[in-house]
């Protein structure tokens, strides 16, 4: 009952989130009274198709989102009774000048593709609304965004999400099939929500260079086939969850340069054909479980484990697993450097692989 009352309370515009001068920004694309065609706020937006050079901040902090360059202004769009600001995916963006001290707290973002709450740390200076450089954004249009210095409670976050959904945002990401570049270079993210990704097939570059994430939720990736660069450069990861990758075929550079990752789970690689550079430069990676590659469908492991720190048991596990796969046609390359050389068990596996046409390079030069 208390939760329901709180939800009702916050379905009104979330002004209470900023009571007492709490820092942050509250930007609504559906409240046309806050939209201007120019960055100074002199020319109001009055019709669909007009450019947006300013969204006035409704938090009381005057952290307005502006764009002084006319060619980089997004468009105000009204379709099916819903008001949104649409990005061109090239250079459109608005910028908030984050004050000294920055923001550490919660960001709630409502878009045409989905709505979610994130933990963030945003340093002082210019911060892009509309994705990094106008390129990377989880949707095509924004409905609203709240950034608060100080974490929102679960109830506050849920109610703010509901507020955006009631005003035209899509409730979840459950209908999205391609997450390509959605959160790429979002280095401000410190935590990622358990959103619905069950329809996702394409995760290319989805979390590329989310450098401040230290963990990742057990999202549903059961339909995912393409994971190229998906978590590349997530330098804060120390572990990775046992997500469902049973449909995954391409894992090229998926965890490239995750230098804090120390171990890896026994994910399902049974449909995988390409693992080139998958764990390249994971310099702290020591532990790979036995059987990880027993059922793979292809042998492209070019530089897959170069610049890692694998234990002898782990490199043996990998080599024995590749033998178990039975791959004897197509691309057959395996590279490891750094870490331990294989034992006699691993060396025997290398001999078998080479007899099947594999090119194998390992620490120690066997």
PLM features per residue range, with description:
Residues 52-100:
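Low-complexity, glycine/proline/serine-rich flexible segments
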Residues 264, 303, 332-336:
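Conserved hydrophobic beta-strand positions in leucine-rich repeat
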Residues 92-95, 117, 126, 131-141, ...:
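Repeated polar recognition positions within modular binding domains
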Residues 99-102, 170-177, 187-201, 211-225, ...:
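Structural signature of tandem-repeat unit edges
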Residues 2-67, 141-144, 152-172:
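GGW-centered surface loops in extracellular recognition modules
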Residues 29-37, 41, 59-62, 113-116, ...:
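Acidic glycine-/aspartate-rich tracts in secreted/extracellular proteins
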Residues 8-34, 82-152, 169-171:
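Extracellular glycan-associated modules
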Residues 3, 16, 341-366:
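Extracellular/surface-exposed low-complexity segments
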